[in-house]
């Protein structure tokens, strides 16, 4: 698809969490640069370190990215994000919690919640809360920013570094 074709399409505002626990700092920075090729990066959260969940392994680094893109959610996920994960060396196994070079999760698209576990997982809630603090939990109405504060304490998530959009 040419740049002109992309300009003529409706733009979508998508929040994506970039996660990695294999060569995590390098892969996080590279992935954010690669996301910039899929649209315009509007904002990038701080990078947070969270313990690996569900299996032994190095801690994860997680960063939320707010992206404006002409790609619809299915094209973005299945043609671009999955390919990017593979290009970064991710191997999918039966173990959903296995260490990985890159994990790209779509959290919201056009203000619609995609990741239903956002409010339960520190690795998602904490970085996303920096970009979308007013997002509310559909069942309780609790603000994501409030939930993230609790999850930071519960999981010992810690801020590692910040990446500027476009760097």
What name fits each language-model region?
Residues 18-20, 65-71, 108-110:
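Short beta-strand-to-loop capping motifs
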Residues 23-26:
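Short N-terminal binding/cap micro-motifs at the start of the first secondary-structure element
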Residues 53-61, 75-78, 82-167:
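Flexible, gly/pro- and Lys/Arg-enriched active-site loops
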Residues 11-15:
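Extreme N-terminal starter segment of soluble prokaryotic enzymes
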């Amino acid at each position: 698809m040419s740049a002109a074709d992309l300009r003529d399409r409706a733009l979508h505002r998508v929040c994506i969490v970039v996660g990695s626990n294999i060569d995590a700092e390098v892969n996080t920075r590279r992935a954010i640069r690669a996301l910039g090729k899929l649209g315009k990066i509007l904002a990038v959260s701080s990078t947070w370190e969270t313990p690996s969940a569900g299996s032994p392994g190095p801690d994860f680094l997680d960063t939320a990215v707010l992206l404006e893109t002409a790609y619809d959610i299915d094209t973005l996920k299945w043609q671009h994000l999955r390919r990017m994960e593979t290009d970064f060396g991710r191997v999918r196994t039966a173990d959903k919690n296995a260490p990985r070079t890159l994990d790209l999760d779509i959290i919201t698209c056009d203000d619609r919640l995609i990741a239903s576990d956002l409010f339960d997982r520190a690795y998602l809630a904490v970085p996303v809360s920096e970009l979308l603090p007013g997002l509310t939990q559909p069942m309780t109405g609790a603000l994501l920013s409030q939930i993230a504060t609790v999850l930071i304490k519960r999981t010992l998530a810690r801020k590692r570094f910040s990446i500027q959009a476009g760097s």
